[in-house]
């Protein structure tokens, strides 16, 4: 038996989200149908609002509803350190530890020849331009501990080092293949404190 078209379309929509397979999408679709109409309307409005009102900061590439973002506008933050991450969610993970007070730069991906992603496909060029205009003395590369993350870190390091800027990499505490997003605050703090020059 096939589901009625509205349910099938809803399931299909949920399956476009990362990590959501057919079973979970079906469960979410039926849960949505059982929600009261006001909650469904608010849910839909919030989805539309997030998509419409959020954009990437013109300075760092983080997701924001203002430009530049709150972090880039914060004059109390150290202008001498820029922590480079893969995705906006990684900024939120780093901010949870409440111990890093520098700036960020979001790449929106990593180098991945298998996926056809080269340097022009991620936010590296803007990082280089930014470093030419800022007093940054250190760039901390916090890409994930994956082969693509490591390759991206080495590539960025080779681009930046000739400018005389110290380039470091998050250290111990992060297992190979792990994502920053899933690390706890203490692990992230130890990784930042133990960063190593590359």
From Swiss-Prot:
- What is the name of this protein? Recombination protein RecR
Q: What does this protein do?
A: May play a role in DNA repair. It seems to be involved in an RecBC-independent recombinational process of DNA repair. It may act with RecF and RecO.
Domain Toprim: where?
80-175
**Organism name:** Latilactobacillus sakei subsp. sakei (strain 23K) (Lactobacillus sakei subsp. sakei)
What does the similarity note say? Answer: Belongs to the RecR family.
Q: What is the lineage of its organism?
A: Bacteria, Bacillati, Bacillota, Bacilli, Lactobacillales
Mention one GO molecular function.
DNA binding
A Pfam entry, by short name: RecR_C
Coiled-coil residues:
none
- Cysteines engaged in disulfide bonds, as pairs: none
Q: Which PANTHER family match?
A: RECOMBINATION PROTEIN RECR
């Amino acid at each position: 038996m096939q589901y009625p078209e509205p349910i099938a379309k809803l399931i299909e929509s949920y399956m476009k989200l990362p990590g959501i397979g057919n079973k979970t999408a079906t469960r979410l679709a039926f849960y949505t149908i059982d929600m009261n109409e006001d909650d469904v309307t608010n849910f839909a409005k919030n989805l539309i609002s997030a998509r419409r009102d959020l954009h990437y900061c013109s300075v760092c590439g983080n997701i924001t509803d203002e430009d530049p973002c709150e972090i880039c506008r914060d004059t109390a933050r150290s202008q001498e350190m820029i922590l480079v991450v893969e995705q906006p969610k990684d900024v939120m993970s780093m901010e949870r530890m409440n111990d890093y007070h520098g700036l960020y730069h979001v790449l929106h991906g990593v180098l991945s020849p298998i996926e056809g992603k080269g340097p022009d496909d991620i936010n590296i060029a803007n990082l280089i331009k930014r470093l030419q205009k800022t007093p940054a003395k250190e760039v901390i590369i916090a890409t994930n501990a994956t082969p693509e993350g490591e390759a991206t870190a080495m590539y960025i390091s080779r681009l930046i080092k000739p400018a005389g800027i110290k380039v470091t990499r998050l250290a111990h505490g992060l297992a190979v293949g792990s994502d920053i997003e899933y690390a706890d605050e203490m692990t992230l703090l130890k990784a930042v404190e133990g960063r190593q020059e590359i």
